[in-house]
Amino acid sequence: MAVFDPDLQPSSDRGHLLTEQSNQRSSHLDQLDTLALLELFADEDRRPQEAVAAVAPALAQAVDAVANRLRAGGRLFYLGAGTSGRLGVLDAAECPPTFCSDPQQVQGVLAGGSAALLRSSEGLEDIEAAGRADLEERGFSTKDCLVGIAAGGTTPYVRGGLAFAKSIGALAIALACVPTEQAPLPCDIDIRLLTGPELLTGSTRMKAGTATKLALNTLSTAVMVKLGKVYGNRMVDVAASNSKLVDRSLRILRDLAGVERERGLTLLEEAGGSVKLALLMAAAGLSVDQAKAHLQQYDQQLRPALAAYGAQLAEA
C-alpha cells in the first residue's frame, strides 16, 4: 500500500497537459470484456508509431548533431525520472553489446540512481537542482549531448538538466509527449511525440513510454550507423561476448565475405573478436595490424576502407 506524506504539496494543476487528459475511447475501460480490452489496447498502440513518424525531421536533426559530437569525442546522456529515465538507461545499456561502443559513450541517468530501476522513486523528480548535479557528477561538458526525457514535459529534474546543458553550450535535446506550448523546455532541438491521452488516464508508461522507446531506438541506432558501426544492415561492430553473438559474428562473415565457419573462427580470434577487422582482413587479404591501421586511416568506416583496396562485400 502506498504511504501518503501529508507534508507533500501538490504540483500546480496539470490537467491541461495532453498526457493527463481523459481518453474518451476508454471511459468504460473497467466494463469491457477481455477481448475488447485487448483490441482497444492494440488499436491505440498504433499512435506511438505515428507520433515518431511525425517528428522525423527533428529526429534527423538530432541524429546528425549527436553523431558530429560523438565523432569529436563527446558523449550522449539520457536524463529522466520514472519510466522516462528507465527507458534511457535501457537504450544506453544496449549500445555496448550491439555496437561495441565504450560504456561511457552513451549513458542513462535516472533520478534516484540504480535503486530507482527496481523501485519507484518518482518523488526525486521534483528536485530541479538534482538534474544538474547528476550531470556534473559525471563530468558533463560542453562537447557532450543531453536528451532530457519527460513525457509530460514538466519534470523539474529534467528541466534542471536541460537548463544546465544549454548554459554551458552542450547540445540539449528535449523529448516530451505534450505540445511545446503546454510545457516548453530549454533546448536546442525540441522533439514532441504526441501520442494523445492514455487509455489509463495519466499512465505515461503506456503509449508515451512506447513512443519514447521507439524514438530512442531510432536515435541511437541512426547515430551508430553514422559512426560506421553498421555495414548494409549488419552490426559489424557487434561485441561477440556470448555464444549467440559469436554465432551472429560468424554468420556475418559468411554472408558478407563468404567465409565459412571454421575460417571465420580463426579470423575472429586473430582480430580479437572484431567482426569489422575480420571482414577487412578477409576481403582485402590484410594482416590484423594492417587492417587496424587501415581502418584508423578511414575513421573506422568499413565501406571506404574496403573501396581503397578495390574490395567489396556482399550486400545480403
Curated annotation (Swiss-Prot):
Residues 1-25 are annotated as: Disordered. PROSITE patterns: GCKR, SIS. InterPro entries: Etherase_MurQ, Glucokinase_regulatory_CS, MURQ/GCKR, SIS_dom, SIS_dom_sf. Residues 66-229 form the SIS domain. GO terms for molecular function: carbohydrate derivative binding; carbon-oxygen lyase activity; ether hydrolase activity. Homodimer. This is N-acetylmuramic acid 6-phosphate etherase. It comes from Synechococcus sp. (strain CC9605). The gene is murQ.
